[in-house]
Amino acid sequence: MNKLVFCLMGPTASGKTGLACELLTHFPFEIISVDSAMIYRDMNIGTAKPSIHELQRAPHYLIDIKDPVESYSAAQFCTDALSLCAEIIKRGNIPLLVGGTMMYFNALQKGLATLPEADEAVRKRLEEEALSQGWDFLYQKLSQLDPVTAARIHAHDTQRIQRALEVYYLTGSTLSTYLTGPHERPDYYFVNLALFPEQRSWLHERIAQRFDAMLSEGFIEEVQQLQAKWPIQINLPSMRCVGYRQILQHLAGHYDYETMREKGIAATRQLAKRQLTWLRHWEGALFYDSQNVGFNTDIIAKIREILDNTVSN
């Protein structure tokens, strides 16, 4: 049991946080957040961060560790998460990694590829091409060269589009080839519990309801407070988080309220689609339909079975 790490993964709005808090009442878990949005301070409503009450009942590591103007990489996440896993196990507890940033899960479990360093000449060429042809054109080019990577990133995520094309031009190999290649893996046994709603319409409705709830709770005001406190720019990594970019554009006068709402919901649904694409191909994952009544009971039973078998062996 010393090397056992549980991972609760799933698309946005699938019920991960509530289930994680429930699991802490049954097992000696300590939660590590696997969410590239929740790392940011002052970004609470739009990231669906656990409430103060939930965090009191179930503290989460790797929440509120960066300012919105800072960046945080998959490599930094791996360093932090592996250090926390070692500390948790040393205390006699079990790490429970919870979130939907699948790139972080992938890097942690499969190891990080040694990618080529940034090349200013290639980046300048790509930026010039983007100016003349548009980022949509470059995204379509990436879709042809590396459809696996293109399916995992947003069509407006210019930073990741540029990096994926840069890797291809520098090496002749796709980014997805690097990520799936043989790397040094951490010495842990990962149990992957995946929330995978079978009906996309159910998840889409939950996403719309949650986005409307965020707006009612003061999402727009949260973004205004960020602008007042920090030199917020739309190209910051923190502003790639769904909802924030759309509200920034609304506040800048580019969208009216209803257009912002529609685009925010659409962007969140696209995020869920990419997360489900990752999960669909996740080898060895145990899948649970979170729209089914009693799915949490099934997960609790499975965890208990795994722990009992680990102790007996």
Swiss-Prot record:
Pfam families: IPPT. Catalyzes the transfer of a dimethylallyl group onto the adenine at position 37 in tRNAs that read codons beginning with uridine, leading to the formation of N6-(dimethylallyl)adenosine (i(6)A). It catalyses: adenosine(37) in tRNA + dimethylallyl diphosphate = N(6)-dimethylallyladenosine(37) in tRNA + diphosphate. This is tRNA dimethylallyltransferase. NCBIfam families: miaA. Monomer. HAMAP family: IPP_trans (MF_00185). GO terms for biological process: tRNA modification. Substrate binds at T12, A13, S14, G15, K16, T17. The record marks T101, R123 as: Interaction with substrate tRNA. Keywords: ATP-binding, Magnesium, Nucleotide-binding, Transferase, tRNA processing. ATP binds at G10, P11, T12, A13, S14, G15, K16, T17. Belongs to the IPP transferase family. Its EC number is 2.5.1.75. One of its GO terms (molecular function) is tRNA dimethylallyltransferase activity. Its cofactor is Mg(2+).
